[in-house]
């Protein structure tokens, strides 16, 4: 028989896959860096580290959470490119950073919060993209 924790962990991993897909889909359809696969991996990795941080016992959950943020920040730094006076990849870095936080939310069992935040993130990216498009047209 399957241990109850494994069912819970599997549900969390599946939800983090869905969260990564939701966030990565917008990036993918607009041909931006860090699309569906990358966001899924970031969400799942953060979820697994979060699950492990509280399931091991005797471990400071805050320290592992801080290390997730540090690791993701290192990954995000690799997406930022400076070309002469232009800086590219800041939004990609921000999206990966937020996706990691959503994966952590799922890992810690905050499903509703994670999905509401993912929806609001998508809405924000959509609205800002439309505003930027209108602004460019006026120029």
Language-model segments: residues:
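Alpha-helical transmembrane-segment detector that highlights a single hydrophobic TM helix
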Residues: 59-85
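Alpha-helical transmembrane segments and their membrane-interface exit regions
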Residues: 72-78, 120-130
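Hydrophobic transmembrane alpha-helices of secondary-active transporters
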Residues: 18-23, 74-81, 103
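Small-residue-rich segments of transmembrane alpha-helices in multi-pass membrane proteins
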Residues: 41-51, 72-75, 94-108
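Alpha-helical transmembrane segments and their membrane-interface boundaries
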Residues: 1-64, 111-116, 126-139
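Amphipathic alpha-helical interface segments
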Residues: 98-100, 118-121
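Hydrophobic alpha-helical membrane segments of integral membrane proteins
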Residues: 89-94, 112-117
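Membrane-helix interface "capping/anchor" motifs
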Residues: 29-34, 81-92
């Amino acid at each position: 028989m399957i241990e109850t924790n494994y069912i819970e962990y599997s549900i969390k991993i599946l939800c983090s896959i869905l969260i990564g897909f939701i966030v990565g889909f917008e990036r993918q359809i607009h041909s931006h860096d860090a699309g569906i696969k990358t966001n899924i991996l970031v969400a799942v990795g953060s979820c697994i580290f979060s699950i492990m941080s509280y399931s091991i016992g005797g471990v400071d959950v805050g320290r592992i959470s801080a290390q997730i943020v540090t690791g993701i920040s290192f990954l995000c730094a690799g997406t930022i490119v400076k070309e002469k006076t232009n800086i590219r990849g800041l939004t990609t870095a921000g999206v990966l950073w937020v996706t990691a936080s959503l994966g952590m939310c799922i890992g810690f069992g905050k499903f509703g919060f994670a999905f509401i935040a993912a929806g609001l993130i998508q809405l924000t990216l959509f609205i800002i993209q439309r505003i930027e498009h209108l602004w460019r047209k006026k120029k």
